Structure formats: C-alpha cells, structure tokens
Amino acid sequence: MWPEYRDLIGGWFNEHPWHQKVRIMVGDLADPLVAFLGPSIEIEDEIYQIRDFDVRGSKVLLRLDPASVDLTRPEVHPQPYGWPLAWTRSYGAGRVFYTALGHEEGIWRDARLQRVMRNAARWAIGKPAEDR
C-alpha cells in the first residue's frame, strides 16, 4: 500500500456491504457544497465502508444513515465515526474532496449529485459553490 494514500484521501476502502436504496444525511447544513440538499436525501448505490478514517483532518459532508440499512450483515464493520460517504480535507497546499458514492451509473445522472460534484470541483480550485 501507498502510505500517503490515507493522508491524501483520509481513509481506506473496507468492503461494500450494501447495494440498495439508502438515506444519506447531510453532515453540515451550512456548508455550501451540500446545503442545497437539505437534511437528507435517498439514493440507490453500492455503499462503501471506510476504515481508519481521519476524523480530525476531514470535514464530513455526507454520511450514511445507519437506520436505512441492515447493520447485522457479516461484512459490516461498525466504526466510532459511522459511515462517512463524502468529505473535504487538505493535503499539503491542496484541497481534497472525496466521495465513496458513484458505483452505480444512475448516481452520475442524479442532478443533486452532479451539483455536489460541480461544487466540490469549484471548492477544490478556490471558487464558491453554485448559487442556485
């Protein structure tokens, strides 16, 4: 493994126990990257778990609502930080946005997630989020 990967991304992949419709909670309703979503959204995707997540160095934007999935599955690895699905962080002088969403093609056609991605790209280059 490339040791700097965790520093860059903020964690490691740790299985994908759910492939279903889930509820995603917005981590910070004041953050312009995701505020337009409201408190939660429902999507259908394959949900990846993250291990060794750097909670202190990351700002979680989206997280899985655990009430929307079966937590008794053998591949589920509960962590004290829950199931973050999108976050921002810094790496050196750079800005990093990561999302564990996007396995299913339909996610890329979802206007809400397209807007999150545009906002994240704008944030990464130091520009404000879309204002609509």
Give names to the regions the model predicted.
Residues 1-14:
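A basic- and aromatic-enriched beta-loop-alpha substructure that forms the phosphate/nucleotide-
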Residues 1-4, 32, 112:
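Exposed alpha-helical structural elements
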Residues 68-132:
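Extracellular ligand-binding/catalytic regions of CAZymes and related secreted enzymes
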Residues 11-92:
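Catalytic beta-strand/loop cores that center a nucleophilic Ser/Cys/Thr
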